[in-house]
Amino acid sequence: MTDNIVKGLGCLFSFIFLMVSCAGTDLTETQVDGAYKGKPVSDILIIAVTGNEHNRRSYERKFVANLKSVGVEAVASEKSISMPGDLKIKKETILSAVDQYKNDAVIITQLVGKETKDVYQRGGVTRYGYFGYTRNPGYSNTTKKVRLETNLYDAKTGELIWSGISKTLSKDSTDRIMNDVIKTVIANLKKNKLIAPK
């Protein structure tokens, strides 16, 4: 009986570990301009390129809040830049917003890939003791795989300072995914000493 319980717990912990290891956000690609000689940026215009205005506002505001929490000034572009139907923002429009807010950098994030999968996990029977058993019901869950590209530009020169592609595999809400991506990007920018408190 004890052996069966131990085996059952082992399977349970293995399952939990698998679920945890499959969640979260990773930067699968990053590129830093080695020729960039400017100082770390400290006042950033945030632009989320999407046709979904709710997601845009939410993402930009979360990014601003997270940057401010580490001492970096930031502003969302939602009030100064209208999103075109083709999602192609003109350079002049961005520069006008930069001039309005006096930013020294621009961060632009856009979706480059998304998959949603519904997975059904069949139930089973766990046996214990001599004749005892329990039946585990099946369940279904939805897993999202989201890939976002985030670029950091020098506001004065338009030079690309840093670029990263994040991959998030999660069953969490869109808001949780946004938070994961933002925190991962900021951590990498700090690691590369590209942002600093103003």
Regions found by a protein language model. Give the residues of each.
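Sec-dependent bacterial lipoprotein signal peptides
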Residues: 1-22
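Generic marker of residues within folded, mature protein domains
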Residues: 5, 12, 36, 99, ...
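Residues that form or immediately flank small-molecule/cofactor binding pockets and catalytic motifs
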Residues: 10-13, 51, 79, 157
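Alpha-helix termination/capping residues and helix-transition junctions
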Residues: 16-19, 38, 100-103
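C-terminal/domain-edge helix-coil "capping" segments
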Residues: 22-42, 137-198
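Short low-complexity stretches enriched in small and charged residues
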Residues: 29-34, 59-72, 120, 194-198
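N-terminal segment of the mature soluble domain
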Residues: 43, 47-116
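Surface-exposed short loop/turn segments
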Residues: 88-152, 156
